[in-house]
Swiss-Prot record:
GO terms for biological process: protein complex oligomerization; protein folding; response to heat; response to hydrogen peroxide; response to salt stress. The gene is HSP16.9A. It comes from Oryza sativa subsp. japonica. It comes from the Eukaryota. Pfam families: HSP20. InterPro entries: A-crystallin/Hsp20_dom, HSP20-like_chaperone, Small_HSP. This is 16.9 kDa class I heat shock protein 1. Keywords: Cytoplasm, Stress response. Residues 36-150 form the sHSP domain.
Length: 150
């Protein structure tokens, strides 16, 4: 059993790692024409909470800021969406491998009550989208001392 296989024996660039579950997966899940978009459609996003804010980071290499939308809907749902277009193809081009994904993506996150949704900021730098949602200061309950008579 070989760990490396060729998609096309005549193409020296077609080496793939062998996947023992590949044939099982293909028999259960039918192939679609959107296989190249599957990875991008489920954009991975990190969400961390700091004492001051909620910070979301998404790796979006090759995506321009005009192709990304950051919105707050229903009062407290952060929506990050966008699209990476396919590269223009020339009929004379011969592709040896297509691994970069393209297509649309959308992710939704329900923000906690302490999120200041009117102060959300977003920036795209070096292919990383960073969305910062400031948190409202937690008011400590006021303690009122009661004098005890007697």
């Amino acid at each position: 059993m070989s760990l490396v296989r060729r998609s096309n024996v005549f193409d020296p660039f077609s080496l793939d790692l062998w996947d023992p579950f590949d044939s099982v997966f293909r028999s259960v899940v039918p192939a679609t024409s959107d296989n190249d978009t599957a990875a991008f459609a489920n954009a991975r996003i990190d969400w961390k909470e700091t004492p001051e804010s909620h910070v979301f980071k998404a790796d979006l290499p090759g995506v321009k800021k005009e192709e990304v939308k950051v919105e707050v809907e229903e009062g407290n749902v952060l929506v990050i969406s966008g699209q990476r277009s396919k590269e223009k193809e020339d009929k004379n081009d011969k592709w040896h491998r297509v691994e970069r994904s393209s297509g649309q993506f959308m992710r939704r996150f329900r923000l906690p009550e302490n999120a200041k949704v009117d102060q959300v900021k977003a920036g795209l730098e070096n292919g990383v989208l960073t969305v910062t949602v400031p948190k409202a200061e937690v008011k400590k309950p006021e303690v009122k001392a009661i004098e005890i008579s007697g």
